[in-house]
């Protein structure tokens, strides 16, 4: 049971959990009430850094959600890498209670990664997409070589973006690649030709919720747990 608990916590959370448990021990040595407060913080850290197994659909045609959260907006915008090209932007807001592990939205190859410095205003605001610190991935899909752009965006509280993907890496749908600590936003930019299957206000689950299809939806899906 302990192994399963540790296995289902993202490694980025280990140091926070160890420090909070140490603080709990010291807190109980000082007073019971202080120890209880510190222990509650430890449990919150475990909850925040949880990394549950997901049932991921299979297929090069699929684009799944890169993050847990709420879809704030779906709209046509200029591509962030080519202002002459129109794309569909799906914005996902992660509150502090969501799972914050990010997953690859489409099977393909990482064409580039880019760190973009910026501010730390609330990630629920539209202007955070342009002003806040973010990490950008550009993925070339296996199917028809479409470019899918993904921005991990820091928020008011989230000030640490972790991205383990690298240029030239072959990635699979639903594969874990990073995490954003303590509330954030993820924007995904898709070709206009994609068939969107979600709506504004919908709650999505990383690796499981299908955001769109590169071509028409298949009649049957297969899944795997990762």
Curated annotation (Swiss-Prot):
It is an enzyme of class 4 (lyase). Its EC number is 4.1.1.65. Signal peptide: none annotated. It holds the Pfam family PS_Dcarbxylase. The modification Pyruvic acid (Ser) is found at residue 184. GO terms for biological process: phosphatidylethanolamine biosynthetic process. GO terms for cellular component: plasma membrane. It catalyses: a 1,2-diacyl-sn-glycero-3-phospho-L-serine + H(+) = a 1,2-diacyl-sn-glycero-3-phosphoethanolamine + CO2. Binds 1 pyruvoyl group covalently per subunit. Pathway: Phospholipid metabolism; phosphatidylethanolamine biosynthesis; phosphatidylethanolamine from CDP-diacylglycerol: step 2/2. It is a peripheral membrane protein. Keywords: Cell membrane, Decarboxylase, Lipid biosynthesis, Lipid metabolism, Lyase, Membrane, Phospholipid biosynthesis, Phospholipid metabolism, Pyruvate, Zymogen. One of its GO terms (molecular function) is phosphatidylserine decarboxylase activity. Disulfide bonds: none annotated. The record marks 183-184 as: Cleavage (non-hydrolytic). It is found in: Cell membrane. Is synthesized initially as an inactive proenzyme. Formation of the active enzyme involves a self-maturation process in which the active site pyruvoyl group is generated from an internal serine residue via an autocatalytic post-translational modification. Two non-identical subunits are generated from the proenzyme in this reaction, and the pyruvate is formed at the N-terminus of the alpha chain, which is derived from the carboxyl end of the proenzyme. It comes from the Bacteria. Its cofactor is pyruvate. The keyword RNA-binding does not apply. The keyword Membrane applies. Heterodimer of a large membrane-associated beta subunit and a small pyruvoyl-containing alpha subunit. NCBIfam families: PRK05305.1-2 (NF003678), PRK05305.2-4 (NF003684), PRK05305.2-5 (NF003685). Catalyzes the formation of phosphatidylethanolamine (PtdEtn) from phosphatidylserine (PtdSer). Belongs to the phosphatidylserine decarboxylase family. PSD-A subfamily. This is Phosphatidylserine decarboxylase proenzyme. The lineage of its organism: Bacteria, Pseudomonadati, Pseudomonadota, Alphaproteobacteria, Rickettsiales.
